[in-house]
Amino acid sequence: MRAIISLLLISTMVFGVIEAVSLEEGLKIFEGERGDCVGESQQCADWSGPYCCKGYYCTCRYFPKCICVNDNGK
């Protein structure tokens, strides 16, 4: 009985690690697909690109002209 429980626990842990690794790889692939980014005051579109570079976020105060704005370290 202990052997069965141990085997189930080990299987669960192995599955959890495999799932975490595949999620991380998927996120890396998604980030790679985003392509080049645009800087401050450049036109952007979070849903389809172009995307803002790291340190900026896309704001749509005057839709459809969305621009990248500095996130000020948020």
Curated annotation (Swiss-Prot):
Pfam families: Toxin_7. One of its GO terms (molecular function) is sodium channel regulator activity. One of its GO terms (cellular component) is extracellular region. The keyword Methyltransferase does not apply. Belongs to the neurotoxin 07 (Beta/delta-agtx) family. 03 (aga-4) subfamily. Aga sub-subfamily. InterPro entries: Beta/delta-agatoxin_fam. It comes from the Eukaryota. The presence of a 'disulfide through disulfide knot' structurally defines this protein as a knottin. Disulfide bonds join 37-53, 44-58, 52-68, 60-66. Negative results: does not affect rNav1.2/beta1 (SCN2A/SCN1B) channel at up to 1 uM. It is found in: Secreted. The modification Asparagine amide is found at residue 72. Expressed by the venom gland. This is U3-agatoxin-Ao1f. The keyword Signal applies. Residues 21-34 form a propeptide. It comes from Agelena orientalis (Funnel-web spider). Keywords: Amidation, Disulfide bond, Ion channel impairing toxin, Knottin, Neurotoxin, Secreted, Signal, Toxin, Voltage-gated sodium channel impairing toxin. Its main location: secreted. Residues 1-20 form the signal peptide. Insecticidal neurotoxin that modulates the insect Nav channel (DmNaV1/tipE (para/tipE)) in a unique manner, with both the activation and inactivation processes being affected. The voltage dependence of activation is shifted toward more hyperpolarized potentials (analogous to site 4 toxins) and a non-inactivating persistent sodium current is induced (site 3-like action). Interestingly, both effects take place in a voltage-dependent manner, producing a bell-shaped curve between -80 and 0 mV. In vivo, induces an irreversible spastic paralysis when injected into insects.
